[in-house]
């Protein structure tokens, strides 16, 4: 362990810039600052050695410093080869937190970075996992199974990682209790929807400077992420087509006025394509061949499996790199495809990801999940769990003052009529918002 690097980032001299930007982000993240205020004295995460695998951004820097402020030891890697913000990584590394992340990692470097977070400086292994997408969870289960007994819990950030946890649970391979942070209302209905509604356009515009108004945009998937993307593209003046497998989501899209069709049909009409599904093989070779000249293709789902990038690389007559994370392919039919971020997350590959305020919702849930799993271990046998509704409401409440929201309070009579506690929870667990 003595040979282990204390950190590896692109450029440690970016730390001062990163620190200034982190201070601005803190002001937009009231939920995380509330966590520090509530728990910095009691330090409920004392003794926790958290290995984190989540986009190393300015917002994540605020999360990391919140975890350390309330007692945890933390080591970090990014969950995407393009998503690290190098000034944020440098700023955190300079504080002494081991960070292994830089923008533009190779796939091999990516795995190396994750592996650096498994053992801490004194040779002791991780005892908590904070994951985004499941790569750290899977690595520990497959390559370091001897460590699983000592791990108290996993908190998982995103839809793809949650799917992975449920697959592991059903196959009997999950060995650690996990909290599904993604499906907290204050995560999925805010980060996934409102975060993507802003950061998708940011990524497309920074990458291409394309005029969206008047274009035909195709959004694959109409879950919370797809809904946010469709709203944004429509607001900029695009005519939006939706593809869906789920009849409920398809009906929702149709009732919102979107045309719902198949990718085989939509690929002939679209100018801009966005995949949001978390599934594989959404845009395949035949779809690329159908597309108009200079169609822009990108993905905002977690992994790069939604677009058949291998087909493009194997079958295009020519590939020209326009600038980092923007490639223009000449197909054999004479038309071009513009691919963003190599088919990986466009909002983080080509822009700065979600704004700080909406990430404060998500990351406050992460902090609560880590505290819950660490301090109430006996409550959680191996399985996948949700945070209680009361905590979900507390996350939302922590963000209201920043927006100038004035909340109505129930009277005793009203609370009795509804059969509720005046302080909540206000909705049953099955309520869908």
Curated annotation (Swiss-Prot):
Q: Which UniProt keywords apply?
A: Copper, Cytoplasm, Hydrolase, NAD, One-carbon metabolism
Cofactor(s) of this protein: NAD(+)
Give residues annotated as binding substrate: 57, 132, 157, 187, 191
UniProt record, GO biological process: one-carbon metabolic process; S-adenosylmethionine cycle
Write out the annotated subcellular location: Cytoplasm
Recorded catalytic activity of this chain's protein: S-adenosyl-L-homocysteine + H2O = L-homocysteine + adenosine
Statement: the UniProt record of this protein carries the keyword Cytoplasm: yes
As for what it does, the entry says:
Catalyzes the hydrolysis of S-adenosyl-L-homocysteine to form adenosine and homocysteine. Binds copper ions.
Subunit text = Homotetramer.
Q: Which family does it belong to?
A: Belongs to the adenosylhomocysteinase family.
Q: What is this protein called?
A: Adenosylhomocysteinase B
Q: Which organism is it from?
A: Xenopus laevis (African clawed frog)
UniProt gene name = ahcy-b
């Amino acid at each position: 362990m003595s040979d282990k690097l204390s950190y590896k980032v692109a450029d440690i001299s970016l730390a001062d810039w990163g620190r200034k930007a982190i201070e601005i982000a803190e002001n937009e993240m009231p939920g995380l600052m509330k966590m520090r205020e509530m728990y910095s004295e009691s330090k409920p995460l004392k003794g926790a050695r958290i290995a984190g695998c989540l986009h190393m951004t300015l917002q994540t820097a605020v999360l990391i410093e919140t975890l350390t402020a309330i007692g945890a030891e933390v080591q970090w890697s990014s969950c995407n080869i393009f998503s690290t913000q190098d000034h944020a990584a440098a700023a955190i590394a300079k504080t002494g937190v081991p960070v292994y992340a830089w923008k533009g990692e190779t796939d091999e470097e990516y795995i190396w970075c994750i592996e650096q977070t498994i053992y801490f400086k004194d040779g002791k292994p991780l005892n908590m996992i904070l994951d985004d997408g499941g790569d750290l969870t899977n690595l520990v289960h497959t390559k370091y199974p001897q460590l699983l007994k000592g791990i108290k819990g996993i908190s998982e950030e995103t839809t793809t990682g949650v799917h992975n946890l449920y697959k592991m649970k059903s196959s009997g391979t999950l060995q650690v209790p996990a909290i599904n942070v993604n499906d907290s209302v204050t995560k999925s209905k805010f980060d996934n929807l409102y975060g993507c509604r802003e950061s998708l356009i940011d990524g497309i515009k920074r990458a291409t400077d394309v005029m969206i108004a008047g274009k035909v945009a195709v959004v694959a998937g109409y879950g919370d992420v797809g809904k946010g993307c469709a709203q944004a593209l429509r607001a900029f003046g695009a005519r939006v087509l939706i593809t869906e497998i789920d009849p409920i989501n398809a009906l929702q899209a149709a009732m919102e006025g979107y045309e719902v069709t198949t990718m085989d049909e939509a690929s002939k009409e679209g100018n801009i394509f966005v995949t949001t599904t978390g599934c594989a093989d959404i845009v395949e070779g035949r779809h690329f061949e159908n597309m108009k000249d200079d169609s822009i293709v990108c993905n905002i789902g977690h992994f790069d499996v939604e677009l058949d990038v291998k087909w493009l690389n194997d079958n295009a007559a020519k590939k020209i790199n326009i600038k980092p994370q923007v490639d223009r392919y000449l197909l054999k039919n004479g038309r071009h495809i513009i691919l963003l971020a190599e088919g990986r997350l466009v909002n983080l590959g080509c822009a700065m990801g979600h704004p700080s305020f909406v990430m404060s919702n998500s990351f406050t849930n992460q902090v609560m999940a880590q505290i819950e799993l660490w301090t109430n271990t006996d409550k959680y046998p191996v399985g996948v769990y949700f945070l209680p509704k009361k905590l979900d409401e507390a996350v939302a409440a922590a963000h209201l003052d920043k927006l100038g929201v004035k909340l109505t309070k129930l009277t005793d009579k009203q609370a009795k009529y509804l059969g509720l506690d005046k302080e909540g929870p206000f909705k049953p667990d099955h309520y869908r918002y």
